[in-house]
Amino acid sequence: MINLIKIGTRSSKLALYQANLVRENLKKKFPNIDYSIVEIKTKGDKIQDRNLDRSIDKGFFVKEIQDSLIEEKIDIAVHSLKDLPVENSSIIKTSAILERGNHKDVFLSRSKKKLSEFTKNEIIGTSSLRRKAQLLNINPNLTVKDIRGNVDTRIKKMINGEYDGLVMAAAGIERLGLEGYISEYLDVEIMLNAPGQGAIAIEINSDKSEIDKIICKIN
């Protein structure tokens, strides 16, 4: 019988929000089980001084959490689905995906301007090559620069004047209650989101059938 489930997650505000959302969903179904949050630093959290698209490799934001799962330091791993590698593993598996949040990207700006109102003298920050390519497709004269850090860190950089605008995932902004910074939601016709964006995935060890029976109930 399972009495405690250890939930592994990154340590950012957004990651902790998502891990706690998983915990609350599990509590509703299994109130007699105890749950603990285990914070784990990933390579993506540690490397903050390089362009993300040049630094990224398989499992950039999840490998250390998956390693802790395989080593049974945690019982389940909570990820943003878009961060998971495409390749399947025989050792671990996705047991559940929570109801998907907003899949769109949003544009944030200090001046509350919309993207169409931006000029080449104003700097837009993004860590994503996908977003940069689409921004320049919308307007080749836009100035787009790399930005790193968690959601709140990026917004602080914008407020402090390092950037005039940002393109980010709507789900993360909404989950942290930061909608007040949104200038507009970007339709997928002009800014196609990442696969799985807005969804939260829960991984387990493939041979843990008892855990699987619990976690799949919140799928």
Protein language model regions, located:
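Domain-level signature for soluble enzymes in the chorismate/prephenate branch of the shikimate pathway
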Residues: 1-219
